[in-house]
From Swiss-Prot:
<dbReference type="InterPro" id="IPR029044">
    <property type="entry name" value="Nucleotide-diphossugar_trans"/>
</dbReference>
<dbReference type="Pfam" id="PF01983">
    <property type="entry name" value="CofC"/>
</dbReference>
<dbReference type="GO" id="GO:0043814">
    <property type="term" value="F:phospholactate guanylyltransferase activity"/>
</dbReference>
<keyword id="KW-0548">Nucleotidyltransferase</keyword>
<comment type="function">
    <text>Guanylyltransferase that catalyzes the activation of (2R)-3-phosphoglycerate (3PG) as 3-[(R)-glyceryl]-diphospho-5'-guanosine, via the condensation of 3PG with GTP. It is involved in the biosynthesis of a derivative of the hydride carrier cofactor coenzyme F420, 3PG-F420.</text>
</comment>
<comment type="similarity">
    <text>Belongs to the CofC family.</text>
</comment>
<keyword id="KW-0547">Nucleotide-binding</keyword>
<dbReference type="GO" id="GO:0005525">
    <property type="term" value="F:GTP binding"/>
</dbReference>
<dbReference type="GO" id="GO:0052645">
    <property type="term" value="P:F420-0 metabolic process"/>
</dbReference>
<keyword id="KW-0808">Transferase</keyword>
<keyword id="KW-0342">GTP-binding</keyword>
<comment type="pathway">
    <text>Cofactor biosynthesis; coenzyme F420 biosynthesis.</text>
</comment>
<dbReference type="InterPro" id="IPR002835">
    <property type="entry name" value="CofC"/>
</dbReference>
<protein>
    <recommendedName>
        <fullName>3-phospho-D-glycerate guanylyltransferase</fullName>
        <ecNumber>2.7.7.106</ecNumber>
    </recommendedName>
</protein>
Length: 237
């Protein structure tokens, strides 16, 4: 399945302090480990899709850089970038300086994705110039693939999917959109963890969350709220 003609980058912040919105449910140590195992799962999928030589993590965090090197992928210094847009822009510029072709940027908190999802995004970008995968909940963008040179303006953040569509249209591009639950579920909120566990994936993230026994933390109002939110989303589907 591996493709050597495309490149994947992942902007990643320091593990320590990651996933603050999960603080009501997980300790600092648990969130730190969760960030690590999620990155492992996303890197595994990317490596299987394009090969380790075509995957890089964009970061200025030493712990993340060391982790990426141990995984066998490249590291791009984000040059102190503030925010995802700035980090991805640095990554794209570094890739454009040494190669041409499609480049895909992925969130590091979508551990349910599989290699064929990445290949599908890259192939769609080659046909349509831009391919996007929206987040399920907040209207964000969990994946964006485009030509590394002819890319559209970056608009990551809540509500960014609509902004990316508008930016593509302004550039006279009709982007491909992949409505994919694996790509769409980023683990940001407590109820996302419950949704992810309900899918029963063969991932490091699934194994780690099951060790934590989240559903057995009875009496914790946030677990109850998370379970209720998951049920509500099922009814809405």
């Amino acid at each position: 399945m591996a493709r050597s003609d495309a490149f994947v980058i992942l902007p990643v912040k320091a593990f320590v302090g990651a996933k603050s919105r999960l603080a009501p449910l997980l300790s600092v140590g648990e969130r730190t480990m969760l960030a690590r195992v999620m990155l492992n799962d996303v890197l595994d999928a990317a490596i299987a899709a394009v090969g380790p030589q075509s995957v890089s993590v964009v970061t200025s965090a030493d712990d993340v850089a060391d982790h990426a090197r141990r995984a066998g992928v490249g590291v791009i210094d984000d040059e102190g970038a503030r925010g995802t847009n700035a980090a991805v822009k640095v990554g794209f510029a570094r890739i454009a300086a040494r190669r041409r072709g499609a480049v895909l940027t992925l969130s590091s908190d979508i551990p349910g994705l599989i290699p064929s999802d990445i290949v599908a995004l890259i192939s769609a970008a080659e046909r349509s110039r831009v391919a996007l995968a929206p987040a399920c909940d907040d209207g964000g963008t969990n994946a964006l693939a485009c030509d590394v040179v002819g890319r559209i303006p970056l608009c990551f953040g809540p509500g960014s999917f609509a902004r990316h569509i508008a930016a593509a249209n302004a550039a006279d591009v009709r982007p491909a959109v992949l409505l994919n639950q694996r790509l769409g579920l980023d683990l940001d909120e407590p109820h996302h963890l419950m949704q992810f566990l309900d899918r029963g994936t063969s991932t490091q993230t699934d194994a780690y969350l099951r060790v934590l026994r989240l559903k057995e933390r009875k009496g914790h109002s946030f677990v109850v709220a998370a379970q209720q939110a998951t049920g509500a989303r099922r009814l809405a589907v």
